[in-house]
């Protein structure tokens, strides 16, 4: 008999908080439990933090449960106050609509929209933007205690700096989302990141207050290092799933260079590798862990960008470590002859300013074709660009410079 999917996710160290664990496990064993995960369209691409949730959704779907991917076109107009210290800039409807279309395409790569338990994309703008305020406050607002809401961590941290009533409405709207999906699609489970716990329990409790005892929720852990620092940040910013924002090579290199103590967690949360295989790969130390890192980098890149791009990234990475592969797949930037080394470093994304670039050179962290750069006044000449020219930052940052 296959292990219950909730227990498997627990064993992988993914689940953190939950409502009514024993009954949820029972429901998941008895048949298809439609579930939903929400994504706010506040950027035109998903990032690695979103993918943790999509992996959980993928696991649940593979176990026979139907995913509802909720695009928060309505709630994004307010903005979730969780983890925020100030009021988010409100997006225009046009911005949100553009982002929703791009995100829909990305999500479709990760969950299956065909079959008996096919995934479905819904947008809460469809039911939130035309709500009658008086009816909503009477039917939904009456079920929420302001005292209890203010005790929630997401609101408590904002009280000192100022919390608007506009933002307080976020919990009610997210809770209403669950109720709407429960009524329309039989959705019985909401999942989300552990920073969403206050908002997530609101929906399940609302449904239960209305007389239904089969509403459940659980949160998954955010992707963090052993020290508790969020993973997924690069020198250029977030680790995006859009290859135009983060190239497959840069994406691969991020996971190839993950810290030794984080490899096991990354493999558990971001791949489908069996736990016994992960244990075997990570039971070693030092240089022997490189095999696990390469497998993690390849598997995660394959899941996001496909096998062909993963192979290209792997080859480019091997080339940079002197194993004779082709450099053709390396990130490339076009520059004009006589560009200064400082500007080249900035264009490559290795520094945000000339001051930072100077510091990197002073620390011996910049090389051109493996020759350490020491001259702050160095210019990239046309002769240099006529041959292969590799700019490196330390052991982890690489790009090829070509003539514009």
Model-derived regions, located:
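Short, hydrophobic/aliphatic alpha-helical segments
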Residues: 30-38, 67, 175-184, 225, ...
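N-terminal catalytic cores of NTP/NDP-binding nucleotidyl/phosphoryl-transfer enzymes
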Residues: 23-81, 190-197
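Conserved nucleotide- and phosphate/pyrophosphate-binding catalytic cores
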Residues: 207-404
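Short acidic, glycine/serine/threonine-rich loops at helix termini
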Residues: 79-83, 131-137, 229-235
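Buried hydrophobic packing segments
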Residues: 53-60, 181, 199-207, 300, ...
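Positively charged, low-complexity intrinsically disordered leader regions
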Residues: 1-35
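Divalent-metal (Mg2+/Mn2+/Ca2+)-assisted nucleotide/phosphate chemistry catalytic cores
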Residues: 12, 92-93, 99-100, 104, ...
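A charged helix-plus-loop insertion that forms the helical arch/lid used to bind
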Residues: 81-97
